[in-house]
Regions:
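N-terminal acidic, glycine/proline-rich low-complexity segments
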Residues: 1-198
């Protein structure tokens, strides 16, 4: 809700999702994402009310109302998507596609960076809820994963001109991204890390 309010998209319904992974306890890693989980942007608390529906039910209802038309975008652990599939398996063939920041596949040397605290061979979103990721990966839904292979690669880094354009912009989303870049730079990483860490 904080980010949606920031970009003026309060028309998008948001339900409270799962507070923990499907099976295990939630790991803590405040270093990766900052004290607020958003690169220390510290956005104001939202004033837009959440949907009274749980995120799982919002997913189910949206897919059922629009069969074959909904692309789910997962920027975190896949717990809510997996639970929606478990609760209402009939939605699985109705989902057009899932695009996820998820996993790493060994496609280049950057795929094996130490990006998850003390677990160097794991990507955070899968590390948090591997059981949910397994359900989604094995569901048969068309799945496009942007893993560490893609998101933490110098080829996707921002140029000096890109950063200058962000600095010159008054748009709140540009300021948000610029703070995220400062956050990762202060930790000794390049701007490309914002595509997966923030």
């Amino acid at each position: 809700l904080k980010v949606l309010e920031m970009i003026g998209r309060t028309d998008v319904p948001v339900g409270k999702g799962m507070v923990a992974p499907m099976v295990r306890a939630t790991p803590k890693d405040p270093f990766s994402h900052g004290a607020d989980g958003q690169a220390e942007n510290f956005l104001p608390e939202p004033t837009t009310p959440r949907s009274p529906k749980h995120a799982i039910d919002l997913i189910i209802d949206l897919v059922k109302a629009n069969p074959g038309e909904v692309t789910l975008i997962s920027t975190g652990p896949m717990s809510n998507i997996a639970m929606a599939m478990r609760k209402e398996p009939e939605i699985i063939p109705m989902i057009k596609e899932i695009i996820a920041i998820s996993g790493m596949f060994g496609l280049n040397k950057y795929a094996f960076a130490n990006c998850t605290g003390d677990t160097p061979q794991s990507e955070w979103n899968v590390f948090v809820d591997p059981e949910a990721a397994k359900i989604v990966y094995e569901s048969g839904v068309k799945l496009t994963c942007l893993g560490l292979d893609v998101a933490t690669h110098f080829d996707v880094n921002l140029t000096d001109d890109d950063i200058a354009a962000l600095d010159a912009s008054d748009k709140p989303e540009a300021k948000f991204l610029r703070q995220a870049i400062r956050f990762v730079n202060n930790r000794g990483f390049e701007a490309y890390c914002t595509s997966i860490d923030c």
